[in-house]
Each structure stands twice: as C-alpha cells, then as structure tokens.
C-alpha cells in the first residue's frame, strides 16, 4: 500500500499538466500554433518520414522536394534524427500533426515528472518538490513553446536525465545515464543542447566532491560523457555544421565591450515565452543563495549569475548572431532546483513546514495569470477549420493522380490564401512532389540570393526566408512549376496546368555569359532567363543577344489615381493614409488584342519605420516589415510581375495604411510569348522514376549538338555528376543552379548528392561508440575499486545525505 502511494504525486502532476495545457492552449484551439508549428515543426518531420518510406534510407542526405532541392541537413533542426520523431516512422497511419501534439504533451509531462523525481533524490520535502515542479511547469516557455517552436523545450526530459545522471555519477561513478541524456538531448535539439550541456557541466562541477578537487583524473572521468555524447552524435553535428557554416546572413552589430557589461534586467528572468520565464523571485534566490547556501548550491548561484547576466554568453550560445534570452531556456530546471534548495533552507531556518509553499504561492499565481495572458495574446493557436482544410486528404489524391500522369521532371505546388500559403510552404504530400517553396532558418545561400536579389520575387511576409508559391509567372516557368493545385470556396480541388514550364533538367546551346547577364537590370534580368541560360563557358557567341533581350519588354506609362491620400511629388508618389486604400493603376497597353505581361518595380521609403508597408497588385503581395520585427525582411524594393488580360488598362492595387514614398518607379509590358516560347529547352531530360529519389537523379537525354545541361536545382558542392559513367565537374549556371557541359549524342545521366561532412560524421560516430564501451569499462572498474575499498574498511568516495533517495 505504501509503495502505491508514492505514485500519487506523479499522477496528480500528470493531471495538473494536462489541465494547464488545456487552460493555456487547448481551449483556444489546437495544441499547435499557426506560427512555425503549422508551417515547419509539423510538416518537415512528415517529409522526413515520407522520404524514409520512399527510399528506405535512415541517413538521408538530400531533400529534393523543398526549396528547389537542398541539403537535408539545412532542415536537421526540425528533428531529422530526433528520438521523439523517429518512432513515428513505425506509425504511417498516424498523421504527423496528431503525433506531434501527443508527443509534445507527453514530453512536457515527462519533464515535470522527472523534475519531481530529481528533487526527491536530494531529500526535499514533498510539498517543496510539488510546488517547484509546478513552478517548472508554469515557467514561460514550457507550455508556450510545446505547441509553437517545439525544439525550444522538447529536449527537457533528456536534460533532466543527464542531471540525474550527474548525481549517479558522483554516487557510483556510473556514466551511462549521464551520457545517454546528453546524447539524446543533442539528437533532439542540437541548438539548445549547447546550453543544456553547459547546465549539466555547471551542476556537475558544483557537485564535485570537495575531497577530490585535486584528482585530475576524476575531472576527466566527469567530462568523458560529454565527449562520448558529442562524438556519437557527430553523424548529425558534422554535416549540420557544414551546412550552416556556408550560410551568410545579416546579424545585428554588437560592440565587444558591451558583451562584458553585466545586465541584471528583470526581463531576462521574468515571464516570457522566449526566455527563462520565471518570476522575479528567481533573482532573489540567486543573490540570497550566495549567502544562505552551502558550497555546491552557492557555486551554482555564482555561475548562474555570471552566465545569465553577462551578454557574451547569450551571444555565444546564439551562435554569435545576436543577444537573445531564448538560448537560456535550458537553465529553467537548474533555477527551479535552486528555488527548491532556497525554500528548504527557509524551512530549516524558521522551522515552519508550510512557510516555503506560502512564500511560493503568490509567484505561482502570477505565473498562471501571466501564462493565461501570453498564451492567449501570443499563442496564435491553429484554427481547427484551417487545419481541417490543410490536412484534407483530397490534396494528396489530386497530387498523386497528377504525378502518376507526369513522365518528365517538373514541380507542383499548392496555391491558396495568404494564410494557407504560409502554412503550406514546407508541406509535401508525396516525396515525388518537388516545389520551389521553403520556410526554414537554414537554407541554400545561392538560392536565397537568387530569390531576394537576382530575380526579386515578392516577399509577402515579415521575414525574408518565407517563400510561398510565387505569383510571378516567369519565375514559375523558370523553376518548372507545371501544376498549381487550388481549392475553390466549395472545397473542390482542381489543377492549373502550365504547359510551357521549363523542365527541371534540360539541354540547350542558347547561352549567355555571366558577365553579360550581370549587366542587365530589371526587367531584363528576368526576361533574359526565358531566352538564354547563363553559363561562363559560352562557346557560341552572338552579337544580337542583347538586342533580343531588350526587345522582350518595353517601358509603359503608368498613372496613379488622383486621391487625397496619394500625392505626386515629381516622379515619386507619397502615400499617407490612416487606412488601406483599394484603387487602380492606369497603364497604356501597346496591344489590346492579346494578353500581356506587366512589370513594375519601385523603392519604398518608409517614413514610419516601426509600421509595416504592404502593397498588393493584381493579387501579388509585397511587404516591408516593421523595423522592430525580430526577423525584419529589409524588403525595400517591391517587384511585381503579373499577367494582364487583353485590353486591360486598369490594374487593381491595395496600399496599406502608413506614411511612405514610392521612388524609382519602373513599369514595362512584355509579350505573352515570354511565357509560351519553349525554344530554350532544346532537349528534355527523361527521368528513370525507379532510381530518381532521395539524393539520386537518374535518366536519359539526347542532344544534337554540344551545349549544357541546365537545371533549376540550387547549386551545392555536394553534387557528383556522371555522363555515361564518366565523372563530370558540375558548374554553377543561371547564377545559382546546377549545370554541366554536354556533348551531342544519346546519354545516360546520374546526379548524386552527398552532404558535406556526412562521411566524416559517421566515422567520428564510430569513435563515439568506442568511447561508450570505454566509458562502461571505466565505470565498472572505478565502481568495483570503490566497493573493494569500502569493504576493506575505507570510507566510500561520496557520502550520501540521509533521505537522498525517493521514498
């Protein structure tokens, strides 16, 4: 009977966790958010699973379906080898979204229960253990991020296992639990595992037995699990590091001297979903703990204060990109442990059993109130009706049917409302469905540059890395988007076919040099790619290329409406309006008998930088995000390319509220033949569907002259190309894509991608497995030696406090 009672607190805590998940999130909608969860965390793991079913490869290297085709380690952050995601591979009948909601809740519950168990090992009273477990649960990021950016917190059970493993290491010199916890933490969330390992290190150093401080070999025994876990996970870490290090991006400039000035602002500790998110009392615990605690907890307080208040640690833990408190989320369990130690000390000093709980109660109430506010205002819970539409199996049926009909290699995308497109950027229904769309914090840099600087596709969202289905028909043709899947208001799904889309791989001898291409400005830098491919080795020269390109679009007069909110200032237009304006632009078409393409580009000068600017032209949306936005898109050049009906001179446009000026306005029209002309694609690649999957493309191509194979697959150094079994050096064509020379004749092509660092990572992981065996041997040796010393009359290595185990 007594043994059964010890499970009662765990059952109660499980129920309390369920209640607060419902209170903070479940009652507001799905246990998933429209921000990131719906567009990244629930769909990219599903793509991993689909590719595994297609290829049977547990160690994939390439993601052909996302962002034109990219190194799969660009997306490793989303759970490529996560121990929480891999079990879903055994459950093909369970939707990934459903699976993730269940796993997120169970992970959160396991974290709370493990925290309760961990504090029990240290002899804390049951009331203190229960109260601090609630504190841990109600910390800002715990529930909030369990349904938003789940990688912020889903490693917590393994972090707690590692902390428990530290205790076992100092008690028995056993390494396994500590090593396992660190390894699983890395595999679950390598980004947060760095800070997680710092937390484990701080806790372990503080618990280092005083009598052994001079035994260097004991310290090396302690850090051995860190090296073992890191080396074992090298098959993930090395190729991921190689993928991330080639990326370049803007980050806020940080002055070196400011990194070493302590910052004791309460916002670093108090309630937020993007930081530690505890109450202000935690700062008092850390400061008073220096005077009230014994050595180990005192050292923990000092080290925590140093790390949490010196900006240099935040900067380092955020990869040197910026200073943000989200990197400190792994400190939550350690700070809650110190809170338990503080309450226990108060209980001992004042001999009042319930005084600690009474002291903590106001802070818990505050966290509940703050949690209600932040989850309701910022949680952005996914709407059930939206999710039902996004997860409608009819999408898959339509896409599967279209793929079954396709003999060539083309792309296929979903098209819908702004919110639907945002949610579908990474959604793949069939691993043979290739797309141009992508929303990921890591990406192919050449492709990103092509989208945002070269072709200047529209940016409809707040950040510059969200690329949904483009409204630019030239871009869709260039990238081989042959089918757009739509759903009408009645829920009927249909396919819009673009017969003139470029094959993803084709051969041509119509080339223009990089030097010539770089001289072209808008819109000719777009129209040129409909007529020529850009390659440096241009063996065929032509003097009339530039003339043909310049004839592809002609300037056209554009007239803005006369409105009290729209003021003409020379060649510029100043828009100052308290509400959005729906109006039309007038243009003089050169022909009224057929459809035409309309090109428009201008610079936006925002007089109110903290207010976003959005302009929607003929259904295409461009946005300049507010300067305060954490991922400001810096989209000051708005580019629109759209189709106009025959004789259409009025173009619908919507100007958002704000105060801004449009300068450098360029407007052109081009013939529809830019879309319908396929003379550039002189020979189409015919894929072998059986072998074209995962990191491999195989098939045949015939060409009647010497030229180039041009692809719309972003270039990467990991590509290996062979023609008829002979290796060919791949080149960068069209400024950002894979290409290579081809001689005339009938050829068999093989394109294989090997992620840089993948092979080295696997070799180092084998070394890690050796270290596991070595660690086990060392732990057995040390444990037996300790036991023999104890039996022969010596004192044990470590004195355990009375009541240190769970009872």
Q: Where do the model's predicted regions map?
A:
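Membrane-embedded helix bundles of polyisoprenyl
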Residues: 13-17, 104-122, 126-170, 174-209, ...
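Membrane-helix boundary/interfacial segments in multi-pass membrane proteins
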Residues: 66, 143-153, 250-275, 302-351, ...
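Signature aromatic-anchored transmembrane alpha helix within multi-pass, membrane-resident enzymes
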Residues: 345-371, 496
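Extracytoplasmic/lumenal acceptor-recognition loop(s) of multi-pass membrane glycoenzymes
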Residues: 74, 366-381, 404-475, 502, ...
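Periplasmic/ER-lumenal interhelical loops and adjacent helix-loop junctions
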Residues: 218-293, 300, 314, 318, ...
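Membrane-interface coil-to-helix junctions
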Residues: 17-111, 134-156, 245-249, 259-263, ...
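Transmembrane alpha-helical segments
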Residues: 111-119, 158-170, 198-206, 283-291, ...
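Active-site-proximal, structured, solvent-exposed surfaces of multi-pass membrane proteins
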Residues: 2-3, 45, 554-791, 807
């Amino acid at each position: 009977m007594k043994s059964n009672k010890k499970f009662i607190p765990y059952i109660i805590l499980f129920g309390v966790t369920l209640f607060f998940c419902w209170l903070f999130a479940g009652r507001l909608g799905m246990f998933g958010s429209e921000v990131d969860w719906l567009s990244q965390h629930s769909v990219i793991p599903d793509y991993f699973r689909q590719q595994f079913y297609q290829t049977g490869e547990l160690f994939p290297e390439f993601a052909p379906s996302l962002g034109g085709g990219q190194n799969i380690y660009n997306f490793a952050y989303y759970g490529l080898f996560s121990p929480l995601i891999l079990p879903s591979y055994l459950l093909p009948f369970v939707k990934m979204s459903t699976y993730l909601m269940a796993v997120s809740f169970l992970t959160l519950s396991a974290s709370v229960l493990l925290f309760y168990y961990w504090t029990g090992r240290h002899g804390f009273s049951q009331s203190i253990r229960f109260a601090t477990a609630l504190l841990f649960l109600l910390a800002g990021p715990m529930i909030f991020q369990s349904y938003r950016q789940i990688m912020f917190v889903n490693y917590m059970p393994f972090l707690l296992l590692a902390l428990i493993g530290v205790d076992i290491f100092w008690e028995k010199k056993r390494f396994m639990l500590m090593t396992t916890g660190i390894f699983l933490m890395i595999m679950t969330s390598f980004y947060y595992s760095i800070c997680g390992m710092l937390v484990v290190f701080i806790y372990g150093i503080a618990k280092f037995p005083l009598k052994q401080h001079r035994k260097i070999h004991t310290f090396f025994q302690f850090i051995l699990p860190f090296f073992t876990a890191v080396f074992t996970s090298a098959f993930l870490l090395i190729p991921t590091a190689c993928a991330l290090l080639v990326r370049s991006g803007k980050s806020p400039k940080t002055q070196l001297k400011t990194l070493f000035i302590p910052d004791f602002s309460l916002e670093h500790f108090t309630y937020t979903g993007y930081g530690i998110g505890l109450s202000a009392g935690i700062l008092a615990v850390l400061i008073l703990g220096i005077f009230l605690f014994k050595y180990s907890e005192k050292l923990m307080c000092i080290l925590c204060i140093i790390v949490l208040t010196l900006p240099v640690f935040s900067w380092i833990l955020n990869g040197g990109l910026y200073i943000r408190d989200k990197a400190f989320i792994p400190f939550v369990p350690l700070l809650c442990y110190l809170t338990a130690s503080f309450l226990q000390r108060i209980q001992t000093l004042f001999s009042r059993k319930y005084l600690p709980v009474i002291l903590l109660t106001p802070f818990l109430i505050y966290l509940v109130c703050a949690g209600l506010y932040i989850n309701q205002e910022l949680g952005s819970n996914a709407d059930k009706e939206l999710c039902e539409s996004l997860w409608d199996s009819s999408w898959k049926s339509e896409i599967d049917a279209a793929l079954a009909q396709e003999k060539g290699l083309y792309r296929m995308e979903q098209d819908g409302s702004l919110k639907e497109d945002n949610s579908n950027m990474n959604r793949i229904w069939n691993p043979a469905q290739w797309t141009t769309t992508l929303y990921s914090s890591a990406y192919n840099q050449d492709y990103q540059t092509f989208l945002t600087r070269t072709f200047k596709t529209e940016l409809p969202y707040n950040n510059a890395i969200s690329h949904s289905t483009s409204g630019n028909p030239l871009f869709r043709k260039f990238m081989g988007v042959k089918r757009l899947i739509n759903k009408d208001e009645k829920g009927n799904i249909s396919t819009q076919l673009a017969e003139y889309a470029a094959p993803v791989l084709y051969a041509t001898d119509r080339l223009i040099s990089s030097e010539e291409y770089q001289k072209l400005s808008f819109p000719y830098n777009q129209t040129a790619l409909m007529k020529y491919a850009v390659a440096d080795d241009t063996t065929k020269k032509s003097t009339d290329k530039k003339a043909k390109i310049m004839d592809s679009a002609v300037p056209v007069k554009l007239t803005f409406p006369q409105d009290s909110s729209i003021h003409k200032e020379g060649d510029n237009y100043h828009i100052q309006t308290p509400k959005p304006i729906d109006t039309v632009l007038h243009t003089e078409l050169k022909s009224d008998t057929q459809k035409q393409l309309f090109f428009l580009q201008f610079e936006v000068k925002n007089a109110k930088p903290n207010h976003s600017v959005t302009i929607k032209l003929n259904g295409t949306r461009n946005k300049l995000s507010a300067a305060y936005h954490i991922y400001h898109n810096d989209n000051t050049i708005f580019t629109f390319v759209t189709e106009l009906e025959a004789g259409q001179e009025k173009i619908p446009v919507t100007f958002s509220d704000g105060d801004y000026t449009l300068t450098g306005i360029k407007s052109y029209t081009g013939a529809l033949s830019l879309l319908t002309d396929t003379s550039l694609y002189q020979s189409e690649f015919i894929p072998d569907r059986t072998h074209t999957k995962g990191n491999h493309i195989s098939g045949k191509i015939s060409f009647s002259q010497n030229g180039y194979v041009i692809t719309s697959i972003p270039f990467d150094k990991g590509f290996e190309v062979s023609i008829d079994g002979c290796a060919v050096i791949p080149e960068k064509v069209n400024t950002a894509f894979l290409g290579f020379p081809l001689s005339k004749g009938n050829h068999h092509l093989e394109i294989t991608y090997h992620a840089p660092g993948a092979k080295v990572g696997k070799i180092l992981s084998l070394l890690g497995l050796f270290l596991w065996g070595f660690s086990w041997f060392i732990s057995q040796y040390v444990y037996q030696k300790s036991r023999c010393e104890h039996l022969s009359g010596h004192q044990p290595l470590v004195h355990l406090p009375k009541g240190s185990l769970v009872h």
